[in-house]
C-alpha cells in the first residue's frame, strides 16, 4: 500500500533516511565535546576528504541559504559582485541573504541555456562595465543541478573555470542537489568540483535524506581563512555540532547519499516516461536530476490540486514542477501519472 502522504512539491517534504537517523541515534549516546570539537564532526570531515580525494576545509551549516550566503561572503568584498543565473536560488529564494552577509555584494544576472551559465554569458556580464562606478565582478556561482533540473558536465565546468581564471573570478557551486548530479553523470565528486576548477562547494544534505544540514567545502584553503568566525557570527556554529555532522557520517560511509540520489533520479525519469505520450503535456526541460517540469493546461493544474496533489507552479503559466525524493515510491509516481492523464483528457 502506498503512502498517500507522499507529495511532489519539494524534495524537502520527505523525512530522514535510515542511515542518517541511525547515525543521529548513535551520536546521542554519552557526552561529546561541543562546538564541533567532537569525534562525529571529525569523522564527517574525513569522509568528505576521502570522497573528494583531497584535503579540503570542511564546515557545517544548518541550511542552504546560510551555506551559500556565508560561502559567497568569504569570496567577496562589499563593493564586489556575484554573477549568477536568473533562476539561481541565491537570486530568487534567499531573501537577500547573500547581499546581507557580504555587506552589499550585488548579484548580477547572466543569461542561461537550459538554466546553465556559459563562458560567453559570464564574459558578457563581467566585461559589461569595468569602471569604478560599477560593482566589480569577483565570483561566479553555479547551481548543480540547476533550478530547472539541468546538469553541468565536467567539461562545461572546466570551460567556465578557465573563463573565471582569465577574468580573476572565484567559482562557487551551490550543490543543494549535487548528489543528483553525481548520480546522473556517473562522475566522481572530485571530477565535478576541484578537478574542474571549483573553489567552494555547498553540498546539500537536506534534500537527500537528512533532516537538516549542509556542508561547505573549500578546495582553496586560503579562501577558508576565518570562515569559522563567519559561521559563528551568523549563528551557524551549532553547540551540539555532532547532530549536524553525524547524519553525514551515516550517508557518506556506505554511499547511501548516492543510492538515494539515484533512486530520486529514477523516479523522475519514470514520471517523465509515463506522461510522455499524453496529448497536451510537454516537458519544459530535459529530465536529468530528480525534477520533472511539465507544461499543463491551467484547468488540469487546478484539477490536480483539487485531487490533493501538491506541486509548485512558479515557472510560468501552465508550468508545473514535480520533485522526487530519496523515498519516493514508484506506485505513487504511477498514481500521479494516471491522474495527470485523466485531468488532461478532461481539460
Task: Name every feature range the model reports, one short phrase each.
Residues 2-285, 289-307, 313-328, 336-346:
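Conserved PLP-enzyme active-site core in the AAT-like
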Amino acid at each position: 500500500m502506498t503512502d498517500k502522504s507522499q507529495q511532489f512539491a519539494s524534495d524537502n517534504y520527505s523525512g530522514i533516511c535510515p542511515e542518517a537517523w541511525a547515525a543521529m541515534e548513535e551520536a546521542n549516546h554519552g557526552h561529546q565535546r561541543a562546538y564541533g570539537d567532537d569525534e562525529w564532526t571529525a569523522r564527517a570531515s574525513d569522509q568528505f576528504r576521502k570522497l573528494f580525494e583531497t584535503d579540503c576545509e570542511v564546515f557545517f551549516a544548518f541550511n542552504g541559504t546560510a551555506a551559500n550566503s556565508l560561502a559567497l561572503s568569504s569570496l567577496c568584498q562589499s563593493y564586489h559582485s556575484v554573477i549568477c543565473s536568473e533562476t539561481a536560488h541565491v537570486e530568487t529564494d534567499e531573501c537577500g541573504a547573500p547581499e546581507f552577509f557580504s555587506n552589499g555584494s550585488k548579484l548580477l544576472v547572466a543569461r542561461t541555456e537550459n538554466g546553465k551559465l556559459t563562458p560567453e554569458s559570464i564574459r558578457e556580464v563581467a566585461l559589461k562595465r569595468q569602471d569604478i562606478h560599477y560593482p566589480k565582478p569577483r565570483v561566479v556561482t553555479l547551481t548543480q543541478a540547476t533550478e530547472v533540473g539541468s546538469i553541468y558536465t565536467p567539461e562545461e565546468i572546466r570551460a567556465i573555470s578557465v573563463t573565471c581564471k582569465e577574468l580573476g573570478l572565484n567559482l562557487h557551486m551551490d550543490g543543494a542537489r549535487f548528489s543528483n548530479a553525481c548520480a546522473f553523470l556517473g562522475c566522481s565528486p572530485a571530477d565535478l568540483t576541484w578537478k574542474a576548477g571549483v573553489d567552494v562547494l555547498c553540498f546539500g544534505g537536506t534534500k537527500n535524506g537528512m533532516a537538516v544540514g549542509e556542508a561547505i567545502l573549500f578546495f582553496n584553503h586560503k579562501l577558508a581563512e576565518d570562515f569559522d568566525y563567519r559561521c559563528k557570527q551568523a549563528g551557524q556554529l551549532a553547540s551540539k555540532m555532532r547532530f549536524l555532522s553525524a547524519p553525514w557520517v551515516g550517508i557518506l560511509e556506505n554511499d547511501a547519499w548516492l543510492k538515494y540520489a539515484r533512486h530520486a533520479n529514477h523516479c523522475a525519469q519514470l514520471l517523465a516516461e509515463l506522461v510522455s505520450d499524453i496529448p497536451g503535456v510537454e516537458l519544459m526541460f530535459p529530465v536529468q536530476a530528480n525534477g520533472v517540469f511539465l507544461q499543463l493546461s491551467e484547468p488540469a493544474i487546478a484539477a490536480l490540486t483539487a485531487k490533493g496533489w501538491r506541486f509548485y507552479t512558479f515557472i510560468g503559466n501552465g508550468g508545473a514542477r514535480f520533485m522526487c525524493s530519496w523515498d519516493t515510491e514508484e506506485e505513487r509516481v504511477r498514481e500521479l501519472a494516471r491522474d495527470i492523464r485523466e485531468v488532461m483528457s478532461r481539460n
